[in-house]
Amino acid sequence: MNPILVAILLGLLQGVLEWIPVSSEGGVALASTVVTGVSPAASTRLALFLHAGTAVAATAYYRTEVRTILHSIRQLSRRPFADETADLSFIVIATAATAVTGLPAYMVLDAAVSELEGGLFLALVGGLLVITGLLQRFAAALSLGEREIPDGFDAVLVGVLQGLAILPGVSRSGTTVSALLLRGHEGESSLRLSFLLSIPAALAANVLVLVDDGIPAIEPLPAVVALIVSAVVGYLTVDALVRLVRQVPFWAVCTVFGGLGVVGGLLVAL
């Protein structure tokens, strides 16, 4: 197949799959292996590389929040997790927790953990989303409290889970959003925190990939095309998802996406 068409396909997949509870890394790597015939290891490195495109999309979509976070850096040491520094504190601590768990998980478990285990974990995440959706549906009747800003426990929990999401078949967004929802954050806030957290994680993964092997499994021009497509499609799809959350009861979104996660995880496992 024409390399540019392959690049468009892979960028499209990355842009769509990044935000939903299906492993974008697994989907892009599988498509790359099937279409181009490169090794699974090279395809996985390419999938990690394409996260830079959706990181750009998240930065552009949440540009106001990113600007506010950068402006709050000076206040971080004096007032961590205050209203104006909560997002920055969350991202810094969660990113550190991701590094602490993600690097050892990659080095120790990457060769040992099978697609079966990753698929079952993704199905578990999907099941948690379904349960979360049902809890959201009956939250008012059960008088479940809501959290308005993240705290240190949220940051450590979500960061650890994001680090473990490097395992085969595990959805980063599905895992982190599920954790935030179960901690009492409302739907749009959970998406926002998860997507903001994806920016430093994706950029760090790209640095590792480029330092290790350079641009993997693809020529420079198709790589640029794939990045552009993933950024544009990622921006459009994250906007569509946020709009959906604003217009549709989030318990329904959780339930549907959780069902997708269960089905996707079982398909990987089988």
UniProtKB/Swiss-Prot annotation:
EC nos: 3.6.1.27
Record keywords, A-Z: Cell membrane, Hydrolase, Membrane, Transmembrane, Transmembrane helix
Cross-referenced InterPro entries, in alphabetical order? UppP
Glycoprotein as a keyword?
A: no
The membrane topology noted for this protein in its Swiss-Prot or TrEMBL record is:
Multi-pass membrane protein
The protein's matches in Pfam families, at most eight in alphabetical order, are given as:
BacA
GO cellular component terms given for this protein: plasma membrane
> Catalyses which reaction?
di-trans,octa-cis-undecaprenyl diphosphate + H2O = di-trans,octa-cis-undecaprenyl phosphate + phosphate + H(+)
Q: Where is the signal peptide?
A: none
Give the similarity note: Belongs to the UppP family.
Q: What does this protein do?
A: Catalyzes the dephosphorylation of undecaprenyl diphosphate (UPP).
Protein name as catalogued = Undecaprenyl-diphosphatase
Protein species of origin: Haloarcula marismortui (strain ATCC 43049 / DSM 3752 / JCM 8966 / VKM B-1809) (Halobacterium marismortui)
